[in-house]
Amino acid sequence: MRVAVFPGSFDPITWGHIDLIKRSLAIFDKVIVLVAKNKSKKYFLSDIERFSLTKDVISSLNFSNVLVDRYSGFIVDYALINSIKFIVRGIRAFNDFDIEFERYLVNNKLNFEIDTIFLPSSAEHLYVRSDFVKELMLKKDVDLSNFVPELVFNRLKSKFIDK
């Protein structure tokens, strides 16, 4: 069985992430969506909220061969512990590629048996970023349906706007 891990902060999960997960399923038998924690990053949602929301969204989409997990540490270590040979990374633009390629080089030095698969974003999701969702969320009456599923919007709205 070909298994891949798709790591990210998912702060929050977007249609861009979901598109990459769907496309990964065309390549792999199983995809583990890994809600990762980067200690140098400041998050909008707590670790538990990011994990719970990502898990709820994946569940609502009825993906039978997608699991959601969480991890704090090097993704390559998670892959090794779980006998996963592939890491999927999404690429929106050239600057994403620069960052992801550097991660690939580090991972390759740590364990050359784990491959990184770079998937470019679909044209309709090139502009979708969790950062934009967070900024737009602070505005009232903004339609975020092109950025996030309704479940995400409602959860964020109840947390940040309805208070």
From Swiss-Prot:
A single GO molecular function term of this UniProt record: ATP binding
KW Transferase (keyword) present: yes
Catalytic reaction annotation: (R)-4'-phosphopantetheine + ATP + H(+) = 3'-dephospho-CoA + diphosphate
Keywords, sorted A to Z: ATP-binding, Coenzyme A biosynthesis, Cytoplasm, Magnesium, Nucleotide-binding, Nucleotidyltransferase, Transferase
One term under GO cellular component: cytoplasm
InterPro entries: Cyt_trans-like, PPAT, Rossmann-like_a/b/a_fold
Quaternary structure (record): Homohexamer.
Protein name as catalogued: Phosphopantetheine adenylyltransferase
